[in-house]
């Protein structure tokens, strides 16, 4: 506890304990030789009702986990299954600390968080909902449905307010985008004749190979599971170089059908998201969420300089992310104080 307090200060005393600190404790326990860590299911599953509810939850939210148990002869009624922590590299999963910057509601958001239509991003006419704007446990199921309705209503208002002032589509730009989008199909059609078998081609890169390459880069150079979530500036600088090389190769993606075309464009988007994650992780010179990631060169939380949001804007021409800070207003806390 003392070592965590030295790292994050008073946050260690918050109740409930922040998710990242629970993950941190998990990692330290395993590093100290205290593994494996297990989920206690045997006691609960003795109750038939709790067993039914438990399986409804497992099969409803983590069906892959149930399949892993079945494949390893694990019955959670008889064995407490092992747990392994592996958060995605966009910070925090359920407790994510990331999302697009969007305008808040008129009746609640501070001026700096509100510039127009509810849930509209900084791109005019582009609206977001759910995990797009930052994931929390409140955005499961009904939460994401509700936020979708809010964004949808705001988008309708935006369209109605345009009236006859509608944007015009450049036909030449539209045709150029069509060629670009379907290019992986053409790359495969031409390149497949250069090989007699297998998946390795001198002319095209399959989406799966590109995805595996991306995962390796992010794991090794952006604080992934294989590195125990540890990262520093030199690692990320090299990671950015490797991502740029991967982006160059994406022009040669090949797709043998529409499903692989979907995978090809998913890979484009994942690489862009990965670049963004790398840029934000490098810009924030502190360890804000130990248990999700650790900056080896800035191992402590630094509220004096980094109690803020970090915002990025992507420059399509230069391919660079421009970073800036934005203030954090504790809206709920302030309203609680006002009510008291």
Which stretches of residues belong to each language-model region?
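Long, amphipathic alpha-helical stalk/connector segments used for oligomerization, subunit docking
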Residues: 161-256
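Alpha-helix termini
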Residues: 143-144, 161, 302
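A conserved FAD-binding loop/helix module that cradles the flavin
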Residues: 133-155
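Mobile, glycine/GP-rich and aromatic-enriched active-site lid/loop segments adjacent to catalytic centers
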Residues: 1-140, 219-340
